[in-house]
Amino acid sequence: MKLFLLFTLTLVNIFSVSLQEPIQNQPAGNNTITSPHRNVWRALSEAEFSGVSAVLVHQLNLTTSRGGNRIIQIDYLYPNKSDVLLFLDHNGEEPKRYARATVQFGSPEVPYLQEYRIGPLPATNTTAVEPLRFPFNGKVQGKTKITSLDADGIDAFLPQLSSVVEDITRKLWNTTLAEGGVSFNLGKASFNSDSTQTIWLGFLNNATTGFDSSTLLPLGVSMQLDITSRDYNDWFVLYWFYNNKLYTPTSFNETVYSSDFQPPLANIDGPWTSTNKQEPTFLLDDLPPPKAISRGKNRYNLDTEENYVQWMDFSFYFSSHTDRGLSLFNVVYKSKRIIYELSLQEALAHYAGVEPVPSEAVYFDTQTGMGRSMISLIKGYDCPDYATYLNSSFSSRTGVTITPDAICLFESDSQFPLRRHTSQAFGYASAARNVVFTVRWIATVGNYDYLFDYDFFYDGAIEVKVRASGYIQGAYYAGNEEYGFKIHDALSGSMHDHVMTFKADLDIYGEKNSVQKVEVVPETTIYPWSQGQPHNTMKLNRGFVTSETDSSIDWAADDAISYTIVNKDSPNKYGEYPGYRFRRVAPAIHLTVKNSTSGGKALHYATHDLFITQQKDNEPCAADRNNAYNIDDPLVDFEKFLDGESLEQEDLVLWINMGMHHTPHTEDLPNTIMTSAYSGIRFEPFNYLESGDPSVKSAQQARIILSNS
């Protein structure tokens, strides 16, 4: 004990000396470099967009009217991997650039969207405009029927609707839709088996405190509209829903005006929805907290023209896309590509509840656009002050929009060592700083804010993390006990699943790879030395996932099974297959609902924790932004990707789900907190580095000689 105490005191004294190193907050600067080649995934320029828009209008005779034949969206169509690899690896030509356009044809009785490919760019009046089919596998590739409301919108109908339901809204809330005293949340516009089209609306109280809190203010009353006709003057109210009962318009009017009717308790806006500072302040919280600083020039290189980054042994390109947000391409580690593409595919939120709108609610956030929803970051809060801030861009119907400071890049200390060891016998202690390089972006989609991180580590690992905040979409509390907790006067937290699907196209020593599966299992065995006595222990069961038939995978309950993308044709010098293992580092879920009534075939990619398929140029994405319009025959039905093909030494793609089962509670008010609503996946070298842990080459480590006297 005496020796231990003396040793400990000596160690503390030595470390205390090292901590006296002066720290200077010097302004950071970017190290500018030139990328090895053009960024073939770069977003459309304004000039490219203008050319595409002009040729579409010219060749398809388009207008700008809301319900007519018009452009809905134009954005960049990423090149095929096969073409890019010819360019990157075989000195081929740079792939030609093409645009994708979604065009609404609103003139037919049943309007529809048609996808087009335009190019090569730059476009002129003679540039080819042809239906885009190859990325889609629906029955009618590249064509999606839409409801009358989706084509025409609801704004023109609002004055008429307000007048029709005024007797109800006056009686219940002493206001009208036209007056703005109440509003509503739109449900899902649906095609029905009898050829009608309907939609539910859930009434909301208005936010009055200057905060975006309307989703916390449900009023417990819903109505269903028939929207079959292309003329909104023919739309009408089909049903009302209140207090777990369905009413016809006539019966609901009679009920509301009956002498014994009890109006629903309203959710009323107030300080409880505000994120302004409230009293009393935390103890000593008025003092300045610790703050991360940069002590010198940035330790990464950047080509801002091509969106190319180098950090330590890593390099990669990034690109922002209207639908999917920020993606990474051609991730190289130690001069070898390890990931061709790392990208968000869909951000799905599936709700449940007793009322029609939450019961039917499935939000496909690429429909809104994760890139369109990228926001300007708040320096010092969303990212460190010393981070590098970059703009992003997205294209829509009318042009290219620049979002300033939408991406941040920075290094940070993880506040725990990457590795360490103290040896009393040999008289030393060693430790290495765990420095992480982060590429961060945030998308605010309606009421929710999603923070995404791509993290790079000294040990060759990459992590993808997502955190959620913002205002929950609440439900009315009456009758909703099986779907949420009562969290305010008349408010229930509406249970929902968040599922964020990522594509990870790994290339380990080339494109031809396999999936190694290793399971830790209990074992009872007799060893030659155990003299016939059984020994209870454990062992490794090694194998491979050889077919797409077996590649719909859920994480083992105790994480006893690990999966690694390996190259069986390039064993290391010890005879093991080099690879990158992938695993969850935070809660990572799949969709709870089986055979979702509201999601149909549009969300098969969310039904397991991960999938592994052969890479194909005609299967570039797990989902499409327009899948929600026709869930029975979506543009991309992911289930069709799983057609039993071999996974033995093929070009493989992982489709990995992150997210959380969210049951809101009182602490979700006013906003959900990111410390609990988060998920993460890690890709890490596994028998990939023959020389061992690469961090031994880092200058950010110390070896301290200990004195025992």
UniProtKB/Swiss-Prot annotation:
Residues 1-20 form the signal peptide. Ca(2+) 1 binds at residues 505-507, 651-652. Keywords: Calcium, Copper, Disulfide bond, Metal-binding, Oxidoreductase, Signal, TPQ. One of its GO terms (molecular function) is copper ion binding. Disulfide bonds join 383-408. Cu cation binds at residues 496, 498, 662. Its EC number is 1.4.3.-. Ca(2+) 2 binds at residues 548, 641, 645. It holds the Pfam family Cu_amine_oxidN2. Its cofactor is Cu cation; Ca(2+); L-topaquinone. Binds 1 copper ion per subunit. The modification 2',4',5'-topaquinone is found at residue 448. One of its GO terms (biological process) is amine metabolic process. GO terms for cellular component: plasma membrane. Disruption phenotype: Leads to the accumu-lation of new glycine-containing victorin derivatives. It comes from the Eukaryota. Topaquinone (TPQ) is generated by copper-dependent autoxidation of a specific tyrosyl residue. The active site is at 365 (proton acceptor), 448 (schiff-base intermediate with substrate). Pathway: Mycotoxin biosynthesis. Copper amine oxidase, part of the gene cluster that mediates the biosynthesis of the secondary metabolite victorin, the molecular basis for Victoria blight of oats. Within the pathway, vicK1 catalyzes the oxidative deamination of the N-terminal glycyl moiety of the hexapeptides in order to produce the active glyoxylate form victorins. The pathway starts with the processing of the precursor vicA1 by several endopeptidases including kexin proteases as well as the cluster-specific S28 family peptidases vicPa and vicPb to produce 7 identical copies of the hexapeptide Gly-Leu-Lys-Leu-Ala-Phe. Belongs to the copper/topaquinone oxidase family. This is Copper amine oxidase vicK1. It comes from Bipolaris victoriae (strain FI3). The gene is VicK1.
